Amino acid sequence: MISPDKQYEADTNLYNPSEIEKKWQSIWTENNLYKTDELTENSDKFYALSMFPYPSGNLHMGHVRNYVITDLIARFQRFKGKSVLHPMGWDAFGLPAENAAIERGISPSVWTKKNISHMKSQLKLLGLSVDWDREFATCDENYYIWTQYLFLELYKAGLVYQKESEVNWDPIDNTVLANEQVDSEGKSWRSGAVVEKKLLKQWFLRITNYADELLKDLEKLDNWPERVKIMQDNWIGKSIGANINFNINTNPEKKITVFTTRPDTLFGVTYLAISVNHSLIKKITDQETIQDIENLKQYLKNNKNNELEKIGIKTSLIAINPVNSEPIPIWVASYVLDEYGTGAVMGVPAHDLRDFEFAKKNNIDIKQVIVKDKSEQSKELDNAYVENGYLINSNQYNGIANTIAKLKIAEEGVNNGWAENKIQYRLRDWLISRQRYWGCPIPIVNCKKCGSVPLNQSELPVALPKDIDISANKINALGDNNNWINTTCPKCGIAAKKETDTMDTFMCSSWYFLRYPSSKCSNKPFEKVEINKWLPVDQYVGGVEHAILHLLYARFFTKALRDNKLFEIDEPFKKLLTQGMVQAAAYKNNKTGKYVSPSDITDLSNPKDPIDNSKLEVLFEKMSKSKYNGIDPESVIKKYGADTARMFISVSYTHLTLPTSVTV
């Protein structure tokens, strides 16, 4: 009888998995068993795809789970008689490869190709039914030429622009991060560094042009996890309201504009709050107030990753409420954000919890303008009333339901010129500039006469230079490479410079699924006829951590390229499975934000950083090379076989997290 408490050793005399699996995998390869069948009019197709891996050098059990789940689905669909496309590739650009190459004093290209070779052999050990004929890496020139081509297509469509902007700067990786790459604690998604703000000239994509369609089309994604759709919905953050203009009493020509979703509470406004960088700050002349604002700026800078106190500084500025001409004091407040709306908000303490707390702390009037029942009168409130109800203390709108009054007051404002109906989004345009070497070069030339000029498509690819200097703990920036940077302007012909920023790696992964159906196409990124046959992907498998990064960007790319008439599909992925993560212990130095390899720790029962002797926090986290907590599946496969490894990783529900402390 088999006991669940007993450990059993594999009897290699009875069963030698390595020998059996090697034999049959060779037969599969020789017979090209998993080559994708050509689609005909009568073919029933199925496109199965895992989010392609970053070639870190070694697979871990988290990778295995992702690819085995997709493989099970692909095999099942083949058994049903369908033509199955199940490809694999490599998300090969990015900072991890550049940093690893610097540490070892070799080219990122050499490092990456070596890793791809090793990881490919590991994937083959798993016996995946992959069509390897369609393989590519995003760092291949014959791939990133088409990333540059698509950049130019988006440029022609008016979806690419450059501007000087305050950006998120990673001081460890020395590069810019998109908003989506900064976590809720204000730290870099990759290095863990506390992100700083810096003013730089950057390239952006107008993803906001598609905000409404990206939001509406979530309703079409019936076979996506609800939590992923909610995350995208919240990230896009649509707010329907109005911009309200308040005159400044000392200067009738000067106005302050406030966005609000609650015009029904305008009669309850008892203060306006502006950010520390609002343009009105320049109108303040009182030196004590100016110094207080500078102190608040420093406080915000020092505490940007902590919960902020509701600090307020009353100014001498007075606004005029457009609905009743009452004077309203203007405060500088710690909670007002520069990057959202107009950098100014109206304070309605009676009907907003945050405003209520701010008003109580700063002795600001609280005026109730909504009650639950028509018969109620205003009273002293113990807390903000935030439910629907009926207006009071609101002149001609008294007794009207606030949901109706919201529309009527906005309409009055529009008719009288002090309001404008407005839809606002939390989503910001996608910042794609990166100040590092190992990425796709941006196909732009900077000319003193013509400005920034896009290259002609015949001049692609703009290839990365191979004569790189790896010294001083960095790879020389593209701007320091005179052999590479100097060129001529494609417009006027005078001497010019190539753009020295490279693209965010998500640019490469936002369209890779479009390349697989015609991966050998040499004169365009993909064959339109093949896209229309195979897309959308029938089953996509990958981690939920990509909900507002890769998945949102891929949806945007698909819609933008559709509008450029490159194909007809609206959405890239029909079904999405976000498999549960495979976790293992990771050791983090909270002082530096860096993870430490367990092999470098003397005593795992009392883990300390070997460099500064700091006590390490033990976290049970998703397996990752950057966290040094991956478990190598090769050792499992070598001892127990691929089928055992596949079964082990597939036994639990696919969407659940699988904690593991596998010892082989």
In which residue ranges do the predicted regions lie?
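Short, solvent-exposed turn/loop segments enriched in Gly/Ser/Thr/Pro and often Arg
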Residues: 40-43, 51-52, 87-96, 135-143, ...
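Conserved phosphate/anionic-ligand binding catalytic regions in large, soluble enzymes, centered on
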Residues: 257-277, 502-513, 545-548
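Conserved active-site neighborhood of enzyme catalytic/cofactor-binding cores
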Residues: 54-85, 188, 317, 340-371, ...
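Residue patterns forming the tRNA-binding/recognition surfaces of aminoacyl-tRNA synthetases
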Residues: 2-6, 14, 23, 27-31, ...
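Catalytic alpha/beta core of large soluble enzyme barrels
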Residues: 70, 83, 278-373, 378-379
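Amphipathic alpha-helical
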Residues: 213-237, 279-310, 471-482
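Conserved oxyanion/phosphate-binding beta-strand-loop segments in alpha/beta enzyme cores
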Residues: 8, 12-49, 78-87, 114-117, ...
